[in-house]
Swiss-Prot record:
It comes from Xanthomonas campestris pv. campestris (strain ATCC 33913 / DSM 3586 / NCPPB 528 / LMG 568 / P 25). The keyword DNA-binding applies. GO terms for molecular function: DNA binding; RNA polymerase binding. Belongs to the GreA/GreB family. GreB subfamily. Keywords: DNA-binding, Transcription, Transcription regulation. InterPro entries: GreA/GreB_C_sf, TF_GreA/GreB_CS, Tscrpt_elong_fac_GreA/B, Tscrpt_elong_fac_GreA/B_C, Tscrpt_elong_fac_GreA/B_fam, Tscrpt_elong_fac_GreA/B_N, Tscrpt_elong_fac_GreA/B_N_sf, Tscrpt_elong_fac_GreB. GO terms for biological process: DNA-templated transcription elongation; regulation of DNA-templated transcription elongation. This is Transcription elongation factor GreB. Necessary for efficient RNA polymerase transcription elongation past template-encoded arresting sites. The arresting sites in DNA have the property of trapping a certain fraction of elongating RNA polymerases that pass through, resulting in locked ternary complexes. Cleavage of the nascent transcript by cleavage factors such as GreA or GreB allows the resumption of elongation from the new 3'terminus. GreB releases sequences of up to 9 nucleotides in length.
Length: 168
């Protein structure tokens, strides 16, 4: 019997052209390179005889299952995604794809974020999902707008310093 999990929230089906290209490249690598490699290794492990005590065979079966699961996910997700490759009609306001610089009103610290789709978030690069609490609070704000965002660490006040969009 499987464990019950509450349904996951629907994520926004938006992605940047770069993010779409990365997901397609990952799918291509999994399907054309990694999967055939694992299938060959699995066949070699199966040829060794008794599969009940064959750790290599068990490992390769699990690895193949993980690859197939990711391939299915990426195939479905790429079909559902909408690539946003045009700048918004109002480049002074914060929308999907914006690179924003914020000032934390409490500490004065400057923070830089890019609002991207949920499939391309990267905390190290400052890329936050459009579904995140901060991005939701940021949408439609303009330079010098002050706003509050309810973050996991509590309520914070920010001021929008810069709004930029990458040239496409």
């Amino acid at each position: 019997m499987s464990r019950w999990r509450p349904p996951a929230e629907k994520s926004t089906a938006l992605i940047t052209p770069e993010g779409h290209a990365r997901l397609k490249a990952e799918l291509d690598e999994l399907w054309r390179l990694r999967r055939p490699e694992v299938v060959r290794a699995l066949a070699a492990a199966a040829a060794e005889g008794d599969r009940s005590e064959n750790a290599e065979y068990t490992y390769r079966k699990k690895q193949l299952g993980e690859i197939d699961r990711r391939v299915r996910y990426l195939s479905k997700r790429l079909e559902a995604l909408r690539v946003v490759d045009t700048a918004p009609t109002d480049p002074q306001a914060v929308f999907f794809g914006a690179q924003v610089e914020l000032e934390d009103a409490d500490s004065g610290e400057l923070l830089r974020y890019r609002i991207v789709g949920p499939d391309e978030t990267d905390a190290g690069r400052g890329w936050i999902s459009i579904d995140s609490p901060l991005a939701r609070a940021l949408l439609k704000k303009r330079v010098d707008d002050e706003f509050e965002a309810q973050l996991p660490s509590g309520k914070h006040t920010f001021v929008v310093v810069v709004v930029e969009y990458a040239a496409t």
